[in-house]
From Swiss-Prot:
<feature type="binding site">
    <location>
        <position position="191"/>
    </location>
    <ligand>
        <name>substrate</name>
    </ligand>
</feature>
<dbReference type="InterPro" id="IPR015933">
    <property type="entry name" value="Aconitase_B_HEAT-like_dom"/>
</dbReference>
<dbReference type="GO" id="GO:0051539">
    <property type="term" value="F:4 iron, 4 sulfur cluster binding"/>
</dbReference>
<dbReference type="InterPro" id="IPR018136">
    <property type="entry name" value="Aconitase_4Fe-4S_BS"/>
</dbReference>
<dbReference type="Pfam" id="PF11791">
    <property type="entry name" value="Aconitase_B_N"/>
</dbReference>
<keyword id="KW-0408">Iron</keyword>
<keyword id="KW-0816">Tricarboxylic acid cycle</keyword>
<dbReference type="Pfam" id="PF00330">
    <property type="entry name" value="Aconitase"/>
</dbReference>
<dbReference type="InterPro" id="IPR036008">
    <property type="entry name" value="Aconitase_4Fe-4S_dom"/>
</dbReference>
<dbReference type="GO" id="GO:0006099">
    <property type="term" value="P:tricarboxylic acid cycle"/>
</dbReference>
<dbReference type="Pfam" id="PF06434">
    <property type="entry name" value="Aconitase_2_N"/>
</dbReference>
<dbReference type="GO" id="GO:0006417">
    <property type="term" value="P:regulation of translation"/>
</dbReference>
<dbReference type="InterPro" id="IPR015931">
    <property type="entry name" value="Acnase/IPM_dHydase_lsu_aba_1/3"/>
</dbReference>
<dbReference type="InterPro" id="IPR015929">
    <property type="entry name" value="Aconitase_B_swivel"/>
</dbReference>
<dbReference type="GO" id="GO:0003994">
    <property type="term" value="F:aconitate hydratase activity"/>
</dbReference>
<dbReference type="InterPro" id="IPR015928">
    <property type="entry name" value="Aconitase/3IPM_dehydase_swvl"/>
</dbReference>
<keyword id="KW-0411">Iron-sulfur</keyword>
Length: 865
């Protein structure tokens, strides 16, 4: 084992990275070596045991905790470990498999003082809290000490407070840094391996950034040169962290700019991030990791500057001269406590533990922690989002700025973030989900899996289902197209994908750490954002699609001066706020998702859309049959699926919807008259904010076209199919087609559309994300593309690609003629589709499809109603 491990260490060192943590097999071999250590290896073996094993409920942690417990009880022997040392090491494992041995040790006079000290600083107690409380009530003095320590918040007060002054060297990335820059999609397979994945950060050359190997390895030498100044680095940018929810972006930044976490291999916390604008999901993920994110004017900060940041005073000064460079205000003073606690999640768990201990001891509420500012009382009404979050908190509504912890009814996880979520769940010692429904998909890696992806496909489903979650299968399709069909109206949820944007209810997408917390605990921390209201009125004009309305939102915001495309001094009214949409109440739920989904591109924290009851009733009746069909097909966890079906049936028995109050307050209101939108609206390369009418970009030569992603539904493929079917001869473009789900693919096949796609020469992908994320298949380098996908960041769909975002209808026309049409040409083509619109835009009602109803009708529930 040692020979193999040292070989691995040498291989990793050649890449300039730390070795991987020990796995369960290596840990088992280490146990045998510790029992009979080879001469001269003693110190090395102890270091491996102490510092190179993941904490929580990792498989290796299970072996480690079992061995240390046996040493503590005298059931195993090692010349390197005393029972006292074993208890001390158990105390470094954070939670999970180490807890019971520590609690047992409270009854051993020799070990109890060490165990009590360890438990005093262990936060992940969950129901084991009551075991300690029981011992304390029975008179165990050490258990009493632990309870008092928790009540006094010693776990928090013994950690260093945030310093008055932070001296750092500026690592500045000008313009916008999106999460694809920090965690490139083609490298998604390596995300759980933080040191390896971090090598790809900023691997594409850009102003001021010098990658070691462009397109492969980021600016490691540049970072190391700045570190020679002797101070930690701070990540600084005009706009930071837009785009996907990937926690790997934060992991990579902190790998170079954060601090080691004692006894936790290959993970870092802390760090400082300064941005003119910091995207909300990235901001939250930084908070969760114990970093200090600050929104501040960075125009006076340059690469390599040494600066002093005063977090309490809200000042940034030149380190040498003391010149004032910028002022700021922390988003919330609670950030100061979050940094001290090692992150927002440890703070929440720790505060909860302190509160529980004080209640058990009959003590008043602790005054140790900073509280979120009280929100001013208001006699105004609540918006729809404020009412939804309020209901999830057991109150009528939640005002903007208020801190709350809403109940998580639905949680989603996908396969490029799922392995990180699994690691976070292990770190949280989670063996069962508290959220009502947790769903895992395999949509980003199913098409062209690497061996590491195949391993994920084999291992992640059982991990999720064993904890009571629902696991999809590779080839089933896109996370959102499935999760939407499992939702309950007016409820709150989250997901480890920035496009988790519920069309019924509301969701606040998050990084893997927060998603794991929400799944494990059933709640999620939220500083309630303000809302921006977008009101549509009037009638849609001929040839105009919902995708055009999606793009009308940034276009009209630009017209009102509420959004700028320029990154320096970026204005974005939607950033960090909730987008609330009204005026389209009769949309089908599948259509409504097109609008809520795109709130991700606005950097909005969440989105609601006001719908009438009828489309929601239709949707739920269909979804009940789909979920029963899943049970018949052997999907699990069965109890969770049955419980969700019962939840839908309960709502249908009394279908009431929350509504915004007429006098609700909004940060801004954008009115859009549908009569004014007479031509398609696209987003130009390479920025989803850069919305333009078709006439402004007409005639642009197009090389490739992609019709797919979570922004599409079956109607889009029928429309494209009808346009393609009328075309004779070869397409002048390369066309990619990827239906969102296996159900869409089956129905399109049955209706003959797959034959049409095949004849046209289209490349038909399996249901899933396909090109959208750019982590597997990609368009040709430098291609000009029309895509129905979610976002068009630089290099996302292909290296150097120029991507226009557009409707499926416009994309199909571009595929046919090899260029962007004029508005008149476009109208000529889509008139063909409009003639059969009733047939084209039919949606999947599973309760009307015999292949689903026949199986669903045979399902007998196994859980009590």
């Amino acid at each position: 084992m040692l020979e193999e491990y040292r070989k691995h260490v040498a291989e990793r060192a050649a890449e300039g990275i730390a070795p991987k943590p020990l796995d369960a097999n290596q840990m088992a071999a280490l146990v045998e070596l510790l029992k009979n250590p080879p001469a001269g290896e003693e110190e090395f073996l102890l270091d491996l045991l102490t510092n190179r094993v993941p904490p929580g409920v990792d498989e290796a942690a299970y072996v480690k905790a079992g061995f240390l417990a046996a040493i503590a009880k005298g059931e195993a022997k090692s010349p390197l470990l005393t029972p006292e040392k074993a208890i001390e090491l158990l105390g470094t494992m954070q939670g999970g498999y180490n807890i019971h041995p520590l609690i047992d040790a409270l009854d051993d006079a020799k070990l109890a003082p060490i165990a009590a000290k360890a438990l005093s600083h262990t936060l992940l107690m969950f129901d084991n809290f009551y075991d300690v409380e029981e011992k304390a009530k029975a008179g165990n003095e050490y258990a009493k000490q632990v309870m008092q320590s928790w009540a006094d918040a010693e776990w928090f007060l013994n950690r260093p407070a945030l310093a008055e002054k932070l001296t750092v060297t500026v690592f500045k990335v000008t313009g916008e840094t999106n999460t694809d820059d920090l965690s490139p999609a083609p490298d998604a397979w390596s995300r759980p391996d933080i040191p390896l994945h971090a090598l790809a950060m900023l691997k594409n050359a850009r102003e001021g950034i010098e990658p070691d190997q462009p397109g492969v390895v980021g600016p490691i030498k540049q970072i190391e040169a700045l570190q020679q100044k002797g101070f930690p680095l701070a990540y600084v940018g005009d706009v930071v962290g837009t785009g996907s929810s990937r926690k790997s972006a934060t992991n990579s930044v902190l790998w170079f700019m954060g601090d080691d976490i004692p006894h936790v291999p290959n993970k870092r916390g802390g760090g400082l991030c300064l941005g003119g604008k910091i995207a909300p999901i990235f901001f939250n993920t930084m908070e969760d990791a114990g970093a200090l994110p600050i929104e501040v004017d960075v125009s006076n900060l340059n690469m390599g500057d040494v600066i002093d940041v005063y977090p309490y005073k809200g000042e940034v000064r030149n380190h040498e001269t003391g010149e004032l460079l910028a002022t700021f205000e922390l988003k919330t003073d609670v950030l100061i406590d979050e940094v001290r606690a090692g992150g927002r999640i440890p703070l929440i768990i720790g505060r909860g533990l302190t509160t529980k201990a004080r209640e058990a001891l009959g003590l008043p509420h602790s005054d140790v922690f900073r509280q979120a500012k009280d929100v001013a009382e208001s006699d105004r009404g609540f918006s729809l989002a404020q009412k939804m979050v309020g209901r999830a908190c057991g109150v009528k509504g939640i005002r903007p700025g208020a801190y709350c912890e809403p109940k998580m009814t639905s949680v989603g996880s996908q396969d490029t973030t799922g392995p990180m979520t699994r690691d976070e769940l292990k770190d949280l010692a989670c063996l069962g989900f508290s959220a009502d429904l947790v769903m895992q998909s395999f949509c980003h890696t199913a098409a062209y899996p690497k061996p590491v992806d195949v391993n994920t496909h084999h291992t992640l489903p059982d991990f999720i289902m064993n904890r009571g979650g629902v696991s999809l299968r590779p080839g089933d399709g896109v996370i959102h197209s499935w999760l939407n069909r499992m939702l309950l109206p007016d409820t709150v949820g989250t997901g480890g994908d920035s496009h988790t944007r519920f069309p019924i209810g509301i969701s606040f997408p998050a990084g893997s750490g927060l998603v794991a917390f929400a799944a494990a605990t059933g709640v999620m921390p939220l500083d309630m954002p303000e809302s921006v209201l977008v009101r549509f009125k009037g009638k849609m004009q001929p040839g105009i699609t919902l995708r055009d309305l999606v793009h009308a939102i940034p276009l009209y915001a630009i017209k009102q001066g509420l959004l700028t495309v320029e990154k320096k001094g970026k204005k974005n009214i939607f950033s960090g706020r909730i987008l609330e949409i009204e005026g389209l109440p009769d949309l089908k739920v599948e259509q409504a998702f097109e609008l809520t989904d795109a709130s991700a591109e606005r950097s909005a924290a969440g989105c609601t859309i006001k719908l009438n009851k009828e489309p929601i009733i239709e949707y739920l009746n269909s979804n009940i049959v789909l979920l029963k069909w899943m049970i018949a097909e052997g999907y699990g966890d069965r109890r969770t699926l049955e419980r969700r079906i019962q939840g839908m049936e309960k709502w249908l028995a009394n279908p009431e919807l929350l509504e915004a109050d007429a006098d609700a307050e909004y940060a801004a209101v954008i009115d859009i008259d549908l009569a004014d939108i007479k031509e398609p609206i696209l987003c130009a390369p390479n920025d989803p904010d850069d919305a333009r009418p078709l006439s402004a970009v007409q005639g642009e030569k197009i090389d490739e076209v992609f019709i797919g992603s979570c922004m599409t539904n079956i109607g889009h493929f029928r429309a494209a199919g009808k346009l393609l079917d009328a075309h004779k001869g070869q397409l002048p473009t390369r066309l990619w087609v990827a239906p969102p789900t296996r159900m869409d693919a089956a129905q399109l096949t049955e209706e003959g559309y797959y034959s049409v796609f095949g004849k046209s020469g289209a490349r038909i992908e399996i249901p899933g994300c396909s090109l959208c994320m750019g982590n597997q298949a990609r368009v040709a380098d430098g291609a000009t593309v029309v895509s129905t996908s979610t976002r068009n960041f630089p290099n996302r769909l292909g290296t150097g690609a120029n991507v226009f975002l557009a409707s499926a209808e416009l994309a199909a026309v571009a595929a046919l003629i090899g260029k962007l049409p004029t508005p008149e040409e476009y109208q000529t083509y889509v008139a063909q589709v409009d003639k059969t619109a009733v047939d084209t835009y039919r949606y999947l009602n599973f309760n009307q499809l015999s292949q689903y109803t026949e199986k669903a009708d045979g399902v007998i529930f196994q859980t009590a109603v």
